[in-house]
Structures are given as C-alpha cells and as structure tokens.
Regions:
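Charged, amphipathic alpha-helical coiled-coil/dimerization segments
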Residues: 71-130
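C-terminal regulatory/oligomerization modules of transcriptional regulators
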Residues: 1-4, 8, 123-142
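N-terminal positioning helix adjacent to the helix-turn-helix/winged-helix DNA-binding module
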Residues: 12, 31-35, 97, 124
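N-terminal helix-turn-helix DNA-binding core of bacterial DNA-binding proteins
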Residues: 22-64
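N-terminal leader segment of winged-helix/HTH proteins
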Residues: 1-29
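Alpha-helical linker/hinge and terminal dimerization helices associated
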Residues: 13-24, 58, 101, 105-117, ...
Length: 142
C-alpha cells in the first residue's frame, strides 16, 4: 500500500483537475469553455439574457463577458438586440446555429464521460460521484 503525504496528494489532485479540464474538452475546438457555458445558460436556463446578468451568474467581469459575447456573435451563435428606447441596453439570444453547436459539443463531451464511466464500472463511478459531491459540499461552504 502506498502512503502519500497531504502535500503529495494535493499535487496529484491538482494535476488531475488540470487533466479533467483539458481531456474531455479537447475535442471541442469550435468553442471555448466560457462560450460553452454561456450557450448552456441560454439553452437550459434563460432563452434571453443581458451582459450584466451573465456577469453576475458566472462571476466574471463585464469586460470578459463582453469579449465572450462578441466572439459568440461573430460566430453567429447568438444574436444581440439593442433596446429600441435605450440603445445602451442589449439583450442576447441564442441562434439556431448556436443551439446546434451547443448540442453537438455537449453530446461529444457526454460521450467522453460515458467512456470514462464504462471504463470505471458502476461501483467506481458511484464512488467517484460520491467524492465529487463531497468536493462540491466543501467548496459551497466557503
């Protein structure tokens, strides 16, 4: 049995988190993680939103949100509509192209995670989910 010190375990966990951020997402070349998150928000939570709401929802600066929205608009994944009365106000909507890209990308990611679940098996997958729940609980306490 290998006994690891806390520092060594923390380092392994740090490396693992980096791997998990890269590997399942690697195939998603069309879209960044931030873009994917915003398209997911527009797909599952609200069909229309504004930059301020996205900034608050994702805890990002308004500048970062603006850059991401501009990128999504250039790719024609969202449509930005200015308020007819107050041109400073903008509403953002997901387009059909955006929905297709989101669905395709989500399906690819889920397929990757399905392969992981198959590799781990039911017992280890359930253990992993239990540990992930504890990790979420830990960070939600902060």
């Amino acid at each position: 049995m290998i006994i690891l010190k806390n520092e060594e375990m923390a380092k392994q966990l740090f490396m693992f988190v980096g791997l998990m951020q890269r590997e399942p997402i690697k195939k998603m070349q069309k879209i960044s993680q931030g873009e994917m998150a915003m398209l997911g928000f527009l797909t599952y939570e609200k069909s229309e939103t504004n930059p301020k709401e996205l900034s608050e929802r994702f805890n990002l600066s308004t500048a970062r949100v603006a850059n991401t929205l501009n990128s999504l608009e250039r790719k024609e994944y969202i449509k930005r509509v200015h308020d007819s009365i107050d041109r400073r106000k903008v509403m953002d909507y997901i387009t059909e192209i955006g929905k297709e890209v989101f669905t395709e990308t989500e399906t690819e990611a889920l397929n990757e995670f399905s392969k992981l679940v198959a590799y781990l098996g039911e017992k280890d997958s359930l253990c992993l989910l239990k540990i992930i729940d504890k990790i979420q609980e830990f960070y939600n306490q902060k």
